[in-house]
Amino acid sequence: MNPSRIRVKMCGMTRSEDIQYAIDLGVDAIGLIFYPKSARNVSLEKARIIVNNIPPFVDIVAVLVNPEQSFVQLIINEIPVQLLQFHGEESSEFCRQFNKPFIKAIHPKTAIQIQSAVDEFFDASAILLDTPSDKGRGGTGLTFDWNIIPENLSKPYILAGGLNESNILEAITMCHPYAVDVCSGIEASPGVKDHLKMSRFIKAIWG
């Protein structure tokens, strides 16, 4: 795969100016975290404001962790999201009930766990591979173990976990993911993006 075709999602957005800068850089997707325990959590009210000027062909992804069905439906009704990303222990039945394209994030320690998730979430748009950690659900800055990813997975996968400007080219060269998802690697502090880091991250991928 040509690294120039790697799709990029920048996650944990909380500010309009960071979203706009990401759009100017050419990212494919913006992630909003709807999880009160996260330092990057956004309310529905804030989400409505910061996504107001997102143009066509930039996907809005709602990131959720073991949410109530009613809360997911509320987000779908209130925010123009293109994708749902489930980051907890949600079942395949739960994820598919909303008739919305979804990504299932997993935190595997073995190749068998990755293949099992691909089989279970057969109708997911993609599987997201993130680092197992007791520190939190994503955005930990801990690097994923690329060596456990099976070859020739039948489903597109998104690589996450500790990606930054220094390791992103090595990651995509070694793993050949469909897309990459970056959060803490482009931040000044949780939820506040560093525009220089954002630029360097994109330049490392696309030149």
Curated annotation (Swiss-Prot):
Catalytic activity, as annotated: N-(5-phospho-beta-D-ribosyl)anthranilate = 1-(2-carboxyphenylamino)-1-deoxy-D-ribulose 5-phosphate
GO terms (BP aspect): L-tryptophan biosynthetic process
UniProt cross-references to Gene3D superfamilies, sorted A to Z: Aldolase class I
Keyword list, A-Z: Amino-acid biosynthesis, Aromatic amino acid biosynthesis, Isomerase, Tryptophan biosynthesis
Pathway note: Amino-acid biosynthesis; L-tryptophan biosynthesis; L-tryptophan from chorismate: step 3/5
Entry keyword Methyltransferase: no
E.C. designation(s): 5.3.1.24
CDD domains noted in UniProt: PRAI (cd00405)
SUPFAM superfamilies listed in its UniProt record: Ribulose-phoshate binding barrel
Molecular function GO terms recorded: phosphoribosylanthranilate isomerase activity
Disulfide bonds: none
NCBIfam families tied to this protein: PRK01222.1-4
Family: Belongs to the TrpF family.
Protein name as it appears in the record: N-(5'-phosphoribosyl)anthranilate isomerase
Name of the gene encoding the protein in the UniProt record: trpF
